[in-house]
């Protein structure tokens, strides 16, 4: 009797589903790719409970015949390749014939479909991979696939699903990537009856970018274009001033397929050269057209990994295209835009604001116990408002022509203003930023800071500054050189550590609320983690699609820090999958102290420098910044005398060496 048997087809499909269908977003990806292959111009994705309860994909594509419909649930049955040679010239997104049978094997599946030349359509109902119903039905041309109770017969997979918000964020990300890959298709994503994403299908990639990432982002994207005998490279990349804290905003497309490729990511960063800050990444959509013979798609069932011939040549082409496009741009940021952002952040509501012009000198306010810059205030008329949703949903306006007439209802509405992200080029280069991914290093840093003991600081008499970076002071033990950035970073850290730890209900109302704009997936992820922001006194409320409004701020946060501070907190929160409020507060204090401190090459007047030393003396540990760097070094009087050879080393006698 043989011990090797051929597995039943349903069981084989469930095994295949383990690789192909990882989560609800995987189902959305596979079914939408099928709709794209069917030459659809409109695709609607509807989900309930993040896709675990229901996923429905409706398209207006070619549809399937009554005879082909049951064959579509057979494993490795496909209309996209017919011979071995076809495997090396694949132009469709699907070709393996695994997705639909895999989905059917772990859910209840209903398919309604019709072709243009058929007298009637067809309906198929399957449960657990077994066909229960197949009959004629009246239905529009195209296909509607409904997936219900996903993973109902694979409880182990269901057990390891993340929260509904996290799964929804993955679905939004998949639809966004496919929308960028195919701007000629009108995509709509509806979750629990609420529309989350809609693109016009006008074929304008910049307009698709505006619908997904927002108008502010789309306006700061520049197009790239280059080609050689094997590749055509196009798309959009962000200006160096517009970056993110991770690579999630980089989208690489090959022949309309979204892929993941480390080397091509590296080529994009190389195209920016030194224009990017360390640890910052651009927003990019790189569309690559390639001869199918040069790309092997048959690497993994998810088809997100591709082996590319002449990969080095493609990397060089991408880097050159980006660097040349950046070279043609005026990379000097507009001063008024950097300071006010009024022209790019107030397009749904009018705005009134004043623009501080920052000089190079810092001053100290003894009443507020903090540093400030003398400001020249420039008044500016409120710009015309324009409607974000109307622009994206209608598909008839271009991003470059954004102004619409201000209506009476808009004029009567309370003023709000879009917050601007911090410019990474203005961040300090004193030391690498806080690496929240390095859990071991982060834990060691937090333990060291938590166990600090009170230190005694010497009395110092300030007498000068060098290169706008180092302060000189003398004391009983000689000369002291103080790193002004590290010194104020320590002062700020202990301030924020105490204030954030004492967060209560003390909030200050904002005269003009701020709007904070995020991508769809980030917006959903932040909603899930909003309790952590609430714990530190930040209360963001949803305000339209992909936007939060901030109406009040904690009293420990200065109003000048709100825009950049809230964005920095949100970016850090998005980078950390799981974090305790204690750890989050500690990380937040370190980050804010670094961002808010005096930088190198910044002149201090004598009074401000002396006040900084007085504040430093009051710190629990005045000798190290939160990252562990020394705040000050000391040359004793004896050290100075040795350096100037005022003290001669005694000659060591032979008797002292023990020879006699």
From Swiss-Prot:
SMART domains (alphabetical): DNA_mis_repair, MutL_C
Superkingdom in the source lineage: Bacteria
Keyword check for DNA damage: yes
Record has DNA repair as a keyword: yes
One GO cellular component term: mismatch repair complex
InterPro entries: DNA_mismatch_repair_CS, DNA_mismatch_repair_MutL, DNA_mismatch_S5_2-like, HATPase_C_sf, MutL/Mlh/PMS, MutL/Mlh/Pms-like, MutL_C, MutL_C_dimsub
Gene Ontology terms for molecular function: ATP binding; ATP hydrolysis activity; ATP-dependent DNA damage sensor activity; mismatched DNA binding
Keyword vocabulary terms for this entry: DNA damage, DNA repair
GO terms classed as biological process: mismatch repair
HAMAP family per record: DNA_mis_repair
Its biological purpose: This protein is involved in the repair of mismatches in DNA. It is required for dam-dependent methyl-directed DNA mismatch repair. May act as a 'molecular matchmaker', a protein that promotes the formation of a stable complex between two or more DNA-binding proteins in an ATP-dependent manner without itself being part of a final effector complex.
Family: Belongs to the DNA mismatch repair MutL/HexB family.
Protein name: DNA mismatch repair protein MutL
Species for this entry: Streptococcus equi subsp. equi (strain 4047)
Gene name as annotated: mutL
């Amino acid at each position: 009797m043989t011990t090797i048997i051929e597995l039943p087809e349903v069981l084989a499909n469930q095994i295949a589903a383990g690789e192909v269908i990882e989560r609800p977003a995987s189902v959305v990806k596979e079914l939408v790719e099928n709709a794209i292959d069917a030459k659809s111009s409109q695709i609607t994705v509807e989900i309930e409970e993040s896709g675990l309860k229901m996923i429905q994909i409706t398209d207006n594509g070619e549809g399937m015949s009554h005879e082909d419909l049951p064959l579509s649930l057979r494993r490795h049955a496909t209309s996209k390749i017919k011979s071995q040679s076809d495997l090396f010239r694949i132009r469709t997104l699907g070709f393996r014939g695994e997705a639909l049978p895999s989905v059917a094997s772990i859910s209840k599946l209903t398919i309604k479909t019709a072709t243009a030349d058929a007298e009637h359509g067809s309906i198929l109902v399957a449960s657990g991979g077994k066909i229960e119903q197949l009959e004629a039905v009246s239905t529009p041309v195209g296909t509607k696939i409904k997936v219900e109770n996903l993973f109902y017969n694979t409880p182990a997979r269901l057990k390891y699903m993340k929260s509904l918000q996290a799964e929804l964020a993955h679905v939004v990300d998949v639809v966004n990537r496919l929308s960028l890959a195919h701007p000629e298709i009108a995509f709509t994503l509806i979750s629990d009856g609420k529309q989350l994403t809609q693109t016009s299908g006008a074929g304008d990639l910049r307009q698709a970018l505006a619908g997904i990432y927002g108008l502010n982002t789309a306006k700061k994207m520049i197009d790239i274009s280059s080609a050689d005998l094997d590749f055509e490279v196009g798309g959009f990349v962000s200006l160096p001033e517009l970056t993110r804290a991770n690579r999630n905003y980089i989208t690489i497309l090959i022949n309309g397929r979204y892929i993941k490729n480390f080397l091509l990511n590296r080529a994009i960063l190389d195209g920016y050269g030194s224009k990017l800050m360390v640890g910052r990444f651009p927003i990019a959509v790189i569309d690559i057209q390639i001869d199918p013979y040069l790309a092997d798609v048959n690497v993994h069932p998810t088809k997100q990994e591709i082996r590319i011939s002449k990969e080095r040549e493609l990397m060089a082409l991408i880097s050159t295209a980006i660097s040349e496009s950046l070279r043609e741009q005026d990379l000097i940021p507009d001063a008024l835009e950097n300071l006010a952002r009024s022209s790019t952040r107030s397009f749904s509501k009018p705005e009134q604001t004043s623009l501080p012009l920052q000089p190079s000198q810092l001053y100290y306010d003894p009443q507020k116990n903090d540093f400030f810059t003398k400001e020249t205030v420039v008044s500016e008329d409120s710009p015309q408002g324009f409607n974000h949703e109307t622009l994206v949903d209608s598909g008839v306006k271009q991003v470059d022509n954004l102004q619409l007439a201000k209506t009476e209802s808009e004029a009567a509405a309370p003023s709000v203003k879009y917050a601007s992200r911090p410019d990474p080029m203005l961040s300090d280069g004193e030391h690498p930023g806080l690496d929240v991914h390095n859990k071991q290093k982060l834990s060691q840093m937090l333990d060291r800071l938590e166990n600090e003991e009170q230190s005694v600081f010497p009395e110092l008499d300030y007498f000068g500054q060098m290169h706008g970076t180092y302060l000189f002071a003398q004391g009983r033990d000689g000369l002291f050189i103080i790193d002004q950035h590290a010194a104020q970073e320590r002062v700020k850290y202990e301030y924020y550590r105490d204030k954030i730890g004492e967060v209560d209900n003390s909030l200050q109302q904002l005269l003009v609320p701020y709007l904070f704009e995020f991508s769809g997936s980030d917006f959903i992820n932040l909603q899930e983690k909003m309790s952590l922001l609430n714990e530190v006194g930040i209360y963001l409320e949803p305000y339209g699609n992909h936007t939060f409004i901030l109406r009040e701020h904690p009293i420990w946060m200065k109003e000048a820090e709100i825009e950049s501070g809230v964005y920095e907190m949100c970016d850090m929160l998005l980078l950390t999958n799981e974090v305790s409020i204690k750890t989050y507060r500690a990380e937040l204090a370190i980050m804010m102290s670094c961002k808010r401190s005096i930088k190198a090459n910044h002149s201090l007047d004598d009074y401000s420098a002396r006040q900084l030393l007085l504040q430093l003396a009051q710190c629990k540990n005045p000798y190290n910044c939160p990252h562990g760097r020394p705040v000050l070094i000391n040359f004793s009087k004896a050290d100075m005398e040795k350096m100037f050879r005022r003290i001669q080393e005694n000659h060591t006698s032979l008797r002292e060496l023990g020879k006699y």
